[in-house]
Amino acid sequence: MSEQPRPEPAGLFDELSPLLAQVVTPVQYVGGEINARLRPWGDSQVHWVLMYPDTYGVGQPNQGLAILYEVINELGWASAERSFSVWPDLEALMRAHGLPQFTLESHRPVRAYDVLGVGLSTELGCTNLLNALDLAGVPLHSDERTMDDPLVLIGGHCAFNPEPVADFIDVAVLGDGEEASVELSRIVRDWRLAGCPGGRDGVLEVLAATG
């Protein structure tokens, strides 16, 4: 959430690739599926990561994730990539080699994006969310985050009672996310174009006022 457009971060696949031979089901980390979307970084004013806090095999079939992925990428001025929880074998290797949580499409660090949207379908995803934030290098507590960190928001069934994770998120979206994701993208874009008035707290106040 820096005041200037984020510089394009480098992908991590060259560092990640040697580790994949040492893990189970490495194909889940490669990406490149049919209909995957990867827009040039400079073509987007708002960069999203849509994360399902479980493994690829559990999260990829989720219809809500697929819908939001399509909606955001159809905006033209915003883009969305996906991220999933990694299995313990790869997590251990990533931590040992200093590699952070990454996106599936470009393998860029999750922390380099503007918005991290997490779909919490069950309470079991809450601990995976915290683990992913830690692996990404994003401060766990929302009041410790700076302009260099993404906005962390949750949606899905568990968002109707956000209190268990209230200290760790910036925004909870209640109900269907199709319209909300567009409005959130517009707010973040307009706030940035205006020079980021009020800093991180400024955009959070605008988001809170939307109800």
Can you say where each PLM-predicted feature lies in the sequence?
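Low-complexity, highly charged intrinsically disordered N-terminal segments
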Residues: 48-53, 57-70, 74-81, 86-94, ...
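Short glycine-rich His-centered loop
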Residues: 18, 22-33, 41-56
